[in-house]
Amino acid sequence: MLGVVELLLLGAAWLAGPARGQNETEPIVLEGKCLVVCDSNPTSDPTGTALGISVRSGSAKVAFSAIRSTNHEPSEMSNRTMIIYFDQVLVNIGNNFDSERSTFIAPRKGIYSFNFHVVKVYNRQTIQVSLMLNGWPVISAFAGDQDVTREAASNGVLIQMEKGDRAYLKLERGNLMGGWKYSTFSGFLVFPL
């Protein structure tokens, strides 16, 4: 009869052998929050992936969508800018949208998609809205037709973000219409880097 030490050595030898039922392109799927994928043809990449090991988090789902349900009217229109606050969050998968500051905070380095749709009231004013990344404008949208009742400023973009980067909308000028939830701000992680 085999002793405990012999059984442990036999088990270790079996585990050290090749994975049963797997080919070199098919990853071994593990239960839980982490997946380790080994590449049988690693490169000489100096970034640390030369070993051919990739670790992916199982909680990579990141998405948010927020709406404004009330009008957003600055008290002074001349050269006054402000963050657009969204008072109702519809989706916040990953809890990376700070509803108090209406700011998205990137949980990891990756490519993110953002879009916004902002409606101006009929007041013969132009609105300008910018998507800001860490305080700098990335894209803007304008609505300024003087002869329409309501007009929308919309835009969308893919952005590479680092962990901790912040994205938010800034009203450069004008008034927003939000009484029927017309103004929206949404984003999601396309893929991590």
Swiss-Prot record:
Glycosylation positions in this chain: N23, N79
Segment forming the signal sequence: 1-21
Task: Give the start-end ranges of region Essential for interaction with NRXN1 and linker of two C1q trimers into disulfide-linked hexamers.
Answer: 34-38
Name the keywords, alphabetized. Answer: Cell membrane, Disulfide bond, Glycoprotein, Membrane, Postsynaptic cell membrane, Secreted, Sialic acid, Signal, Synapse
Q: From the UniProt record, which GO molecular function terms apply?
A: identical protein binding
Q: Quick one: where's region Essential for interaction with GRID2?
A: 122-147
Q: Give the C1q domain ranges.
A: 57-193
UniProt modification remark: The proteolytic processing to yield cerebellin seems to occur either prior to the secretion by presynaptic neurons and subsequent oligomerization or in some other location after release of the mature protein.
Which compartment or compartments is the protein found in? Secreted; Postsynaptic cell membrane
InterPro entries for the chain: C1q_dom (IPR001073), Cerebellin_Synaptic_Org (IPR050822), Tumour_necrosis_fac-like_dom (IPR008983)
Q: Which PANTHER family match?
A: CEREBELLIN-1, CEREBELLIN-RELATED
- Its biological purpose: Required for synapse integrity and synaptic plasticity. During cerebellar synapse formation, essential for the matching and maintenance of pre- and post-synaptic elements at parallel fiber-Purkinje cell synapses, the establishment of the proper pattern of climbing fiber-Purkinje cell innervation, and induction of long-term depression at parallel fiber-Purkinje cell synapses. Plays a role as a synaptic organizer that acts bidirectionally on both pre- and post-synaptic components.
Name of the protein: Cerebellin-1
Which species is listed as the source? Rattus norvegicus (Rat)
